[in-house]
Amino acid sequence: MLRVAVPNKGSLSEAASAMLSEAGYRQRRDSRELVMVDPDNDIEFFFLRPRDIAVYVGRGTLDVGITGRDLLLDAEVEAEELLPLGFAASTFRFAGPVGDFASAEELEGKRLATSYDGLLRGYLAERGINAKVVRLDGAVESSVRLGVADAIADVVETGNTLKAAGMEIFGDPILKSEAVLIRRAGGTTNGTAKEVDVLIRRLQGVLVARQYVLMDYDIRKELVEKAAALTPGLESPTVSPLRDSDWVAVRSMVPKKETNRIMDELYDLGARAILVSSIHACRI
């Protein structure tokens, strides 16, 4: 049975469970449940703190897990990323008092507060920057005002909290993070490789289904090539004959975010009966 770690709370939890549900896996109905078995798919889910998931997977206690890329790197364990999942995006950045710093190199000899000391130490070591890392469990924005640190390194989404604390972002991003599927480095060791492959394919199918729609339309034969240039699909659009031999029906997958633009251009080209359908699931 495949053993999978899922975040039990926070911004990762709801989105991870929704994605697994879309992939056809049973998910818990009570947020107090810590373990749930899906017998139909021969899989067992363990709901854990997001920060602990990389540790369990890295030690081989669990086969795979969903966590943040930032949490994976911060854990400094023998686990590797299998698949980016497209949600919980964030950026790990340096911030300091307005006007005090312009680049990471200026942090030499300074005190840096963070909740991600493993990730930060690795970044500083790669660049040969000697700075004192001060680990805090949260509210690192207050550390500079309280005299604990000269600057901070933290996950930034909007930057509003930093501005309220009289701070600004500086330097290049330390890391661009999102939710990821991870496994122990070197692969699973308990004969679950096939089940992991199925899980990856299903999650990839959800990602594609979220990013694309199916577009159907009718168009005159002589305009098919021009229409196909607008809707090339993943390999090629499907073209089917109609009762009126001068016309054909075309079906193609198109990026969801470009749907209305493509519909407008097809209509201007001469296409009619343009319809769009959602994709529930797919295998590409």
From Swiss-Prot:
Enzyme class: transferase
Activity control mechanisms: Feedback inhibited by histidine.
Function comment: Catalyzes the condensation of ATP and 5-phosphoribose 1-diphosphate to form N'-(5'-phosphoribosyl)-ATP (PR-ATP). Has a crucial role in the pathway because the rate of histidine biosynthesis seems to be controlled primarily by regulation of HisG enzymatic activity.
InterPro entries per record: ATP-PRT_HisG_long, ATP_PRibTrfase_cat, ATP_PRibTrfase_CS, ATP_PRibTrfase_HisG, HisG_C, N-reg_PII-like_a/b, N-reg_PII/ATP_PRibTrfase_C
The EC number(s) this enzyme carries: 2.4.2.17
Localization terms from the record: Cytoplasm
Catalytic reaction(s) noted: 1-(5-phospho-beta-D-ribosyl)-ATP + diphosphate = 5-phospho-alpha-D-ribose 1-diphosphate + ATP
Name of the molecule in the record: ATP phosphoribosyltransferase
Swiss-Prot/TrEMBL cofactor(s): Mg(2+)
Pathway, per record: Amino-acid biosynthesis; L-histidine biosynthesis; L-histidine from 5-phospho-alpha-D-ribose 1-diphosphate: step 1/9
Superkingdom of origin organism: Bacteria
Entry keyword set: Amino-acid biosynthesis, ATP-binding, Cytoplasm, Glycosyltransferase, Histidine biosynthesis, Magnesium, Metal-binding, Nucleotide-binding, Transferase
Molecular function in Gene Ontology: ATP binding; ATP phosphoribosyltransferase activity; magnesium ion binding
Organism: Pseudarthrobacter chlorophenolicus (strain ATCC 700700 / DSM 12829 / CIP 107037 / JCM 12360 / KCTC 9906 / NCIMB 13794 / A6)
Record family assignment: Belongs to the ATP phosphoribosyltransferase family. Long subfamily.
Gene3D superfamilies in alphabetical order: 3.30.70.120, Periplasmic binding protein-like II
Gene for this chain: hisG
Pfam families with a match to the protein in the record: HisG, HisG_C
